[in-house]
Amino acid sequence: MRLAKYFFIAAACLLQGCGTPYATMKKRMGEDVMLLGHDPVAYFTEKQSLRGDPAIKTSLPGRTYYFMSEENRQRFLAAPESYEPQFGGFCSSGAAFAIKLGSDPTEWEIVNGKLYIFGDILGHEAWRLDRDANISHAEASWSEARDVGWRWQSLKRVSFRVPWYKTGADIRREFAAKYPRRKWPDYDVGSKIQNYFSKDPGWRAREGHGPQPVVGFVGEDACPPACPRTSSSPFSVK
């Protein structure tokens, strides 16, 4: 069974590629951009998800960041480790299970001076159920996942789960027990084909999948909404 699973993962990666090691979206000119072009520094200074300007950018191996201002770019260059999102910008909830999948720049949180991004509101809510344990698990697993393409790593760890893995049903039960008066968000995550094979991380936010507001990809998509130096809106729980 294990051999069959590895064969499937290898075949999938041969057909679609193993994915990038960071949660990037590729521009038509080939640039791999983080956070759909949102400014990583603005999360700290403005406490908002704000789009950067493609003309004000800096590149690190495998990823490029846009900034609202030259001042923010210089802040980043002085200490990139202080501003880069944890776990390659992938969903911090999935990272707790050594999975690199999903990235929504409008779902974020800063804890102890570190920026955590989530794939969607469901990942964010799941992570909050046991924030410290999820951070600890993700940090312990990151050496395994850091340099691996997201598709390969996610398919591997969905097939061969870490001992502390939780299913969606497990998480919903925990949520109901902790918040008996709250409803689990009604959010469409898309299909497995879309999330694992046909789309890049961040696609749901970019396209406005289901009830998700269209965030767009600054420098690539129409303005509005994807205008430089503007804020972007997250999915709103009704």
State each model region's role.
Residues 18-61, 82-238:
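Intrinsically disordered, low-complexity terminal tails and linkers in eukaryotic proteins, enriched
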